[in-house]
Amino acid sequence: MAKLTLKDLELNNKRVLVRVDFNVPLEAGRVTDNTRIRAALPTIEYLLDHGARVILMSHLGRPKGKVKEELRLDPVARELESLLGRQVHKVNDCVGPEVEAAAAALKPGEVLLLENLRFHPEEEKNDPGFARQLASLADVYVNDAFGAAHRAHASTEGVAHYLPAAAGFLLQKEIETLGKALADPERPFVAIIGGAKVSDKISVIRNLLTKVDTLIIGGGMANTFLKAQGYAMGKSLVEEDQVPLAQELIQLAAQKGVKMLLPRDLVVAQEFKADAPHQVVAVNAVPDGWMALDIGPETARAYAGALEGARTVVWNGPMGVFEMEAFAHGTEAVARAVAAVDGMTIVGGGDSVAAVEKMGVAGKIGHISTGGGASLEFLEGKALPGVVALTEK
C-alpha cells in the first residue's frame, strides 16, 4: 500500500487515536451482533502489544448532532472489555476538558473509548475546529473504519490533516483485497449484483462491465432488466425510469464481450408477504397481478454453474426477498455456490453477508467486507475520502 500502515509507525508510549466502526446493533442496552467490534481487534491488540496508549472513537446510529441516551457507547465499552479481557475507560464526550484529561492520563497498554462522535453536528460537517480538537488528543491517527471511509467526516477525513495518518489492519485488508480484485483479478472474474434497485447499483455495474468476464444480475433489480428485454413483469418492482438505462447496460455488456446473466425463471407471489401464495414461472409467463420475489430454481442452477471454475468472485446484494423464508432459496443457492469457488471470493452488503452467515459458509469466503456503502463506492471506482486523506509513505 502507498499509504502509511500500522507497521510503519513507532508506537511505544505514543497516544494513538483510532477511528473504528463500532456502529453495532443494540437491544436493551446490549450489543446483539459484535462482528464489527471483533473486526477491529487485530488493530487494537497490535497497538496495545506495542506499548501504545489507545484512544478509540466511533459513531453509533443517527443521533443527528444531539445527545441521545440510547445511543451512548457504554454497551460497546462493556462488549469490548469482554473481548479484550482488559479494562476499557469510557468518557461521556469526545472533545472537551474531561476527555483531554482522560487522554493525558492514559498509560501504555490502556484503552479509552470516546463517546458517540455524531452527538456533535460538527462530525458529519467535517468541521476543521472539531477535527483539530480530536487530533489534539493524540500523537498519531489510525483509520480502521472501512465502513465509514466513503464519508468525509471530521473523524475519518478531517483529523488526518493534523496528525500522521495510517491505515489499520482492517482498512488495509479491505483496500488491498478489493483493489486487487478490480485492478489485477485472476480470471475468470465473475460479479454477482443483486438487491432491490438498479438505481443504487448503476455505477457499480458500469464500472464492473469494464473488468469482469461474467456479470450475474438478481434480486428486484433484475425485474427492470427483464422489462428492458420486453417481458411483462406483472406487479413486480420495476424502475420504469431506469428501463432505457438497463437496455444500454445490456448493449454495453455485449460490446465488451461480457456474459450478462439474467433470470430464466422466477418465484412469483400474489403479495409482498412471507406466507403469500407463490409459484415458479418462466420469465415470459409472469401472471398479471403477481410479483417476482426471488430467482427460480433453474436460474439458481445456471448461476451456480457460471461460478464453477471462477478464480475471482465479487458478490453484493441478495437474489430475492431473503428475509422471507419462501423467497430466500435463490440467495441461499448463490451463497453455497460462492463458498464452493476455489479462488478469491469477496462478499459485501448486509444481506449477502447475512446469507453466507446463515448458511454457515462464512468461513469459506475469502473476504467478507465490513463496509456496505464503502465497498459499493470502491466497486464504482470512486476514491474514498477516508483513504485519500491518509499519509503517503
Curated annotation (Swiss-Prot):
The reply on keyword Metal-binding is no
Q: Which PROSITE patterns match?
A: PGLYCERATE_KINASE
What the entry lists under InterPro entries is as follows: Phosphoglycerate_kinase (IPR001576), Phosphoglycerate_kinase_CS (IPR015911), Phosphoglycerate_kinase_N (IPR015824), Phosphoglycerate_kinase_sf (IPR036043)
| Pathway(s) this gene product operates in, as recorded in its UniProt entry | Carbohydrate degradation; glycolysis; pyruvate from D-glyceraldehyde 3-phosphate: step 2/5
Name the CDD domains for this protein.
Phosphoglycerate_kinase
Q: Name one GO cellular component term.
A: cytosol
Quaternary structure and interacting proteins, as annotated: Monomer.
Regarding protein family, the annotation reads: Belongs to the phosphoglycerate kinase family.
In Swiss-Prot or TrEMBL terms, this protein is called Phosphoglycerate kinase
What is the protein's species of origin?
Moorella thermoacetica (strain ATCC 39073 / JCM 9320)
Question: Which lineage is the organism of this entry classified under, starting from the top rank?
Answer: Bacteria, Bacillati, Bacillota, Clostridia, Moorellales
